[in-house]
Amino acid sequence: MPRSLKKGPFIESKLEKRIAALNSKDEKKVVKTWSRSSMIAPEFVGHTIAVHNGKSHIPVYVSENMVGHKLGEFAPTRTYRGHAGGKSEKGGSAPRKK
């Protein structure tokens, strides 16, 4: 469920201050954050933000079409390793019962 428009977007204040400081100095450093729920604002465009996925920080380069989304959408937390299955040389599975 999206956030109410009268409340406005949630952006962690510390993250917002860091990006504002980088914008005033015209610097492009990687900013680490654990705030996956922060909304991407137009001021973030062009910066690389390292978003924590529970194990490590994933660098996310912010482009214009990411504005309005949350940072956590671009740092997946789960790794898919495939379904378990029998590895036979023929490539087939066990014969089915009728």
Curated annotation (Swiss-Prot):
InterPro entries: Ribosomal_uS19 (IPR002222), Ribosomal_uS19_bac-type (IPR005732), Ribosomal_uS19_CS (IPR020934), Ribosomal_uS19_SF (IPR023575). GO terms for biological process: ribosomal small subunit assembly; translation. Belongs to the universal ribosomal protein uS19 family. Keywords: Ribonucleoprotein, Ribosomal protein, RNA-binding, rRNA-binding. Residues 77-98 are annotated as: Disordered. Pfam families: Ribosomal_S19. This is Small ribosomal subunit protein uS19. NCBIfam families: rpsS_bact. It comes from the Bacteria. One of its GO terms (cellular component) is cytoplasm. PROSITE patterns: RIBOSOMAL_S19 (PS00323). Protein S19 forms a complex with S13 that binds strongly to the 16S ribosomal RNA. The gene is rpsS. GO terms for molecular function: rRNA binding; structural constituent of ribosome.
